[in-house]
């Protein structure tokens, strides 16, 4: 299926079509560069459907985090039940959203990535814990299939924490507990549909 996706993208670009692809487009970095070069050659737009990054609430979350709302970020914890994620996407599609969230919050200058997959007796993948180590922070990504994983995104800072409950990949609400403040800060934004409309809005102004 992954190979078919890449082939479909290549053929569409060669025909001068704009392409919005499920993520990941390909698992090969060189192939990814080739596809973007092909898009430039044919003067069309190629984007991955990482709708999370186009949501107003998530953009605000990143802005507040980088603005030290909860101080220096020391950890980002991202958990997702694969069955709850858009009807049960495959592992690569699920982990792409989680990695995107971590990189938007902590940046691209990580030191190492480790994965710890757990399989059941018949060899089927049931759980994975991925750790991404940064110079002064740690990101953990927890993905479960048949095991109970509570969907949430938590940002732990030196002066508090921010929590995005439930289906954080459709961020519409988050709350912050800031050191020295008695009450939670709550942030709520309208969210409609599956997020695709927000990506399309961005494409309209490209």
Regions found by a protein language model. Give the residues of each.
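Rossmann-fold NAD(P) dinucleotide-binding segment
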Residues: 3-22
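Contiguous beta-strand/loop segments that form the cofactor/metal-binding neighborhood of enzyme cores
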Residues: 93-171, 200-206
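C-terminal helical cap and adjacent loop that interface with cofactors, partners, or active-site loops
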Residues: 182-206
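A contiguous active-site-proximal alpha/beta segment in oxidoreductase catalytic domains
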Residues: 3, 26-85
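Short, well-ordered coil/turn segments that N-cap beta-strands
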Residues: 17, 44-45, 135-137
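Hydrophobic residues in well-ordered beta-strands that form the structural core
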Residues: 21, 46-48, 164
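A general structural signal for well-ordered alpha-helical segments in protein cores
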Residues: 5-9, 32, 58, 98-99, ...
């Amino acid at each position: 299926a992954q190979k078919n996706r890449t082939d479909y993208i290549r053929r569409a670009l060669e025909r001068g079509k704009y392409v919005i692809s499920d993520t990941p487009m390909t698992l090969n970095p060189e192939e990814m560069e080739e596809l973007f070069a092909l898009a430039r050659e044919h003067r069309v737009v190629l984007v991955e459907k990482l709708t999370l990054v186009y949501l107003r609430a998530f953009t605000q979350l990143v802005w507040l985090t980088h603005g030290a709302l909860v101080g220096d970020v020391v950890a980002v914890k991202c958990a997702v039940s694969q069955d709850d994620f858009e009807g049960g996407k495959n592992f690569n599609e699920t982990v792409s959203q989680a990695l995107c969230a971590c990189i938007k919050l902590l940046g691209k200058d990580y030191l190492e990535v480790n994965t710890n997959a757990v399989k059941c007796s018949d060899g089927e993948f049931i759980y994975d814990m991925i750790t991404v180590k940064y110079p002064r922070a740690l990101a953990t990504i927890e993905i479960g299939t048949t095991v109970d994983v509570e969907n949430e995104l938590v940002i732990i800072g030196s002066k508090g924490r921010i929590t995005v409950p439930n289906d954080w990949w459709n961020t519409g609400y988050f709350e912050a507990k800031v050191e020295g403040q008695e009450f939670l800060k709550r942030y709520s934004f309208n969210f409609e549909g599956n997020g695709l409309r927000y990506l399309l809005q961005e494409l309209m102004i490209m």
